[in-house]
């Protein structure tokens, strides 16, 4: 059995090698010759999977080691009788920790307390729900906007996007990209939305680039609108707008979900789905795959205030490590993808053991996702 995998899926060759011959290839553009004789294809978000790619091939299963699926024509796969699996939630923790890293940086720079802010979360799925729980653990007020869940009658208090526009100091987008239909998210943050934001707001997009109208955002910033912006995703990619890059506060190359744990979860989820598809179900214990973290343990004294939380969060992941390289090389062709392809290992907060003086501190840090204990 021939299994084609994206060369940037960690642990893919070792895991899928249990099931057949593995051929690792680049994801963008994916070499068509590699698909000849392939039985399965494992991709990331950089590869568009549709009839044009797979027609005439014998591929009978496609897996994407990503939470999002807008790069895959799932309707055509179903029509063609090709099995499919994504990895929902695989990188949700990493995206949440990216948002916190960015907010802590802005809070320190601009001199505000996060507890005094209201955070509006647009899209309350795997990422948004985890973000809401961690913000709540810190006593931060949240407003949730998720029309599909609201219409289903889910047991949450949901708000309209207009409510968030008026009331939220920080608005962060975590929706899929829907280009049509009743829950269209294409340019959800359009010129009218941006124009209606009160001064001093913070806008974060770590979901899909086209959820925010990048042309309208650039126009607003060029016109002098008082708006702080964090962008991890762009419209389009990989050819992002250099004028927009120059005007946003934090800019990164679509890596919010790129923790080592998140990538490994994506690979293991599609591996387990494919093994089940073959009738040979196998499970993987994630920690057994991961190397020791660069910093394994720290001790803190007293209850962690915002400054201490920032130090702990940035000890594991400081968003500036991705902002600086992107600004340095963005004008060069191919560098956006190169930064993603050669992304250095990044860990999640759970990799850091924090030794505390008291149970209250340990409980707070545990709720935030650290491995905290009293010692």
From Swiss-Prot:
Single GO term (MF): protein dimerization activity
InterPro entries: D-isomer_2_OHA_DH_cat_dom, D-isomer_DH_CS, D-isomer_DH_CS1, D-isomer_DH_NAD-bd, Erythronate-4-P_DHase, Erythronate-4-P_DHase_dimer, NAD(P)-bd_dom_sf, PdxB_dimer_sf
Entry's EC annotation: 1.1.1.290
Keywords from the named record: Cytoplasm, NAD, Oxidoreductase, Pyridoxine biosynthesis
UniProt keyword annotation of Transit peptide present: no
Pfam families for the chain: 2-Hacid_dh, 2-Hacid_dh_C, DUF3410
Gene Ontology annotations of biological process type: 'de novo' pyridoxal 5'-phosphate biosynthetic process; pyridoxine biosynthetic process
Positions contributing to NAD(+) binding: 146, 175, 232, 257
Catalytic activity: 4-phospho-D-erythronate + NAD(+) = (R)-3-hydroxy-2-oxo-4-phosphooxybutanoate + NADH + H(+)
Active-site residues (renumbered): 208, 237, 254
Compartments it resides in: Cytoplasm
GO annotations of cellular component type: cytosol
Keyword Hydrolase appears in the UniProt entry: no
Top enzyme category: oxidoreductase
Residue positions binding substrate: 45, 66, 258
Pathway: Cofactor biosynthesis; pyridoxine 5'-phosphate biosynthesis; pyridoxine 5'-phosphate from D-erythrose 4-phosphate: step 2/5
Record's subunit section: Homodimer.
Function: Catalyzes the oxidation of erythronate-4-phosphate to 3-hydroxy-2-oxo-4-phosphonooxybutanoate.
NCBIfam families, per database record: PRK00257.1 (NF001309)
Family designation: Belongs to the D-isomer specific 2-hydroxyacid dehydrogenase family. PdxB subfamily.
Protein name (record): Erythronate-4-phosphate dehydrogenase
Organism from which the protein derives: Edwardsiella ictaluri (strain 93-146)
Gene for this chain: pdxB
């Amino acid at each position: 059995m021939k299994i084609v995998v994206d060369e940037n899926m960690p642990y893919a060759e070792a895991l899928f090698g249990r099931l057949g011959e593995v051929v690792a290839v680049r994801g963008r553009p994916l070499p068509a010759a590699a698909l000849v004789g392939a039985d399965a294809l494992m991709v990331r978000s950089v590869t568009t999977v549709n009839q044009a790619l797979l027609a005439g091939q014998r591929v009978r299963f496609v897996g994407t080691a990503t939470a999002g699926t807008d790069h895959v024509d799932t309707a055509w796969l179903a029509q063609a009788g090709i099995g499919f699996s994504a990895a929902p939630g695989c990188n949700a923790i990493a995206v949440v920790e990216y948002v916190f890293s960015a907010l802590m940086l802005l809070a320190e720079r601009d001199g505000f307390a996060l507890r005094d802010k209201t955070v509006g979360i647009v899209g309350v799925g795997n990422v948004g729900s985890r973000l809401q729980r961690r913000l709540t653990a810190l006593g931060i007020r949240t407003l949730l906007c998720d029309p599909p869940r609201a219409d289903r009658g889910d047991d949450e208090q949901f708000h309209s996007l207009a409510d968030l526009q008026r009331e939220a100091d920080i608005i962060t987008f975590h929706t899929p990209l829907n280009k049509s239909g009743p829950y269209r998210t294409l340019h959800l943050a359009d010129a009218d939305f941006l124009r209606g934001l009160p001064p001093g707001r913070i806008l974060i997009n770590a979901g899909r680039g086209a959820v925010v109208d990048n042309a309208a955002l650039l126009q607003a910033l060029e016109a002098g609108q008082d708006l702080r912006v964090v962008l991890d995703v762009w419209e389009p990619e990989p050819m992002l707008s250099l004028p927009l890059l120059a005007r946003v506060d934090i800019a990164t190359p679509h890596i919010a979900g790129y923790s080592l744990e998140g990538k490994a979860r994506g690979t293991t989820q599609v591996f387990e789905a494919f093994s089940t598809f073959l009738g040979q179900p196998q499970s993987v214990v994630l920690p057994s795959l991961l190397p020791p973290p660069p910093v394994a343990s720290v001790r803190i004294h007293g209850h962690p205030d915002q400054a201490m939380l920032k130090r702990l969060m940035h000890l594991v992941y400081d968003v500036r490590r991705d902002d600086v390289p992107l600004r340095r090389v963005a004008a060069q062709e191919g560098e956006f993808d190169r930064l993603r392809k050669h992304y250095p290992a990044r860990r999640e907060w759970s990799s850091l053991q924090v030794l505390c003086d008291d149970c209250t501190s340990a409980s707070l840090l545990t709720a935030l996702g650290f491995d905290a204990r009293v010692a």
